[in-house]
Amino acid sequence: LTNYEPVIGIMGKTGVGKSSLCNALFAGDISPVSDVAACTREPLRFRLQVGDRYITLMDLPGVGESGARDTEYAALYREQLPRLDLVLWLIKADDRALTVDEHFYHQVIGEVYRHKVLFVISQSDKAEPTSGGGQLSTAQKQNISRKICLLHELFQPVHPVCAVSVRLQWGLKVMAERMIKCLPREATSPVVSQLHPSFRTTVVREQARSDFGETVGAVLDSISAFPLIPAPVRAVIQAVRTTVVSVARAVWDFFF
């Protein structure tokens, strides 16, 4: 359980800010992603290490930039989606060309994998009316809220849409908390250990602690359900389950 290596896909069109968002969220350094067209035929992978913990980030090409490529990308996504714990789907605040994105989401992601997608509005500081200042204006925040409503209407996502600005360091803490809640239970603790310290909030840590305990409990349930387990042993496992889960939560800090 403590050695699980999560795989997170980062999806978005060229210039959406995938690398800058990852560098802002995670404590380790991440190599810049090449925008050379040939490099997008296979997803680029980056292994991020902090201490003895690892996560893999997979750069996934955005759709809608090349009609000839979108069919190829559909096959790529269908191959990779089962291996991913989460997909961060980045959409620029000023991107209005979403018809292809909508079609791709409903036809390729579909009902099977939509729970793995977290939509993120990136570069929120570029929302109209742009000012280039040190904080978002009231008008920009209103337009971002409208964009969030639009994405909910178009995609009907499982998880709430996030909005961030790496340049202004705006929205990142909320996004980190939502990202942790979207991950499968076995992935939350390893990802939390990789987050920049400022995003390891109480909410984030307690979510990971709870998930770790529940994951331990699920392992015990699997063992007790094994057909060859003698009934007395099964009874003991079931009797101590609550205690073991509580202990796992208590020692979470030691492991992560």
Which functions belong to the PLM regions below?
Residues 1-9, 13, 33, 143, ...:
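N-terminal low-complexity/disordered regulatory or targeting extensions
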Residues 1-60, 247, 254-255:
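Conserved G1/Walker A P-loop phosphate-binding module
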Residues 40-43, 60-87, 91-110:
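Switch II of P-loop NTPase G domains
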Residues 53, 82-87, 113-117, 156-160:
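Short glycine-/polar-rich loops that comprise or flank the Walker A/P-loop
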Residues 64-65, 96-97, 127-128, 195, ...:
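Catalytic P-loop NTPase motifs of RecA-like helicase/translocase cores
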Residues 125-193:
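Canonical P-loop GTPase G-domain recognition
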Residues 209-256:
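Membrane-inserting effector segments that mediate pore formation, membrane fusion
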